[in-house]
Amino acid sequence: VKLGNTHVLCSAVIEDRVPGFLRNSGKGWLTAEYGMLPSSTNERVDREAARGKQSGRTQEIQRLIGRSLRCAVNLDILGEKTIKIDCDVISADGGTRTASIIGGYVSLARAINSYKKKYNLNNQIIVNQIAAISVGVVKGTACIDLDYPEDSSAEVDCNVVMSNDGQFIEFQSTGEEAKFTKQTILEFIELVEKVMPIINKAQDIACLLYTSDAADDTPC
C-alpha cells in the first residue's frame, strides 16, 4: 500500500492453530506484526531483531493493527485458525500505522477469499471493511493524512480507524504540548468522513485486481 511517500508491504497468512487460551473453543484469532526496514527512514534504523527486543512503539502499533482488523472478521465462523497480518514499512513518511491497517485489510480480505475458494466455503467470514487515516492540527489548521514534517510539528495528533458503515473502532487523539476543543474533534470527524469512502473504494479495487487463482497468494 502507498500513501504518498509512505509504502508498506502487507500480507496475511491463515494457520491451523490458535493461542492456548482459545484451544477447544471453536473460535479463531487474528494477530499482527509490524516492523520498519532499516532503510525506510532518512537515517538508518537498526533492526529490532538485532537489538533483541521490540520497542514500545512497535508493540503499541501491532496491538492497534490487530485490534482494528479483528473487527473485520467473524472469529466464531473462522474456527480454530489464526490469521497473521504482517506489515513491513519500506518507506516511512508519516502514517505508517494507518497505512498498515489499510493494506492489512486488503491482504486479510484476499487471504479469506482464497481460503473460502480452497475449501468451497460460503460462510460470511469478513463482516466489516476497515480503514484508517491520520489527522491533526498543524499551524492551527486541521489537516488529514499527515506526512512526517507535518506529524512531527503538529499541535494535535490523531489516528482514526473506522468501518465502512461509518462507525468508529479507534479514535486516538493527543495534544502535543497543547490543548484542543470539542470543535477540533468535530473537524477531525468531518475530514475523516469525507476521505474514508475514497479509501474504501481503493481497497475494493485492490481486492478486485487479484481475484484470479494465480494471484490469490500475492501480497498487497
Please describe what each predicted stretch is:
Residues 96-116, 122-166:
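Long, charge-patterned amphipathic alpha-helical coiled-coil/hairpin "stalk" segments used as oligomerization
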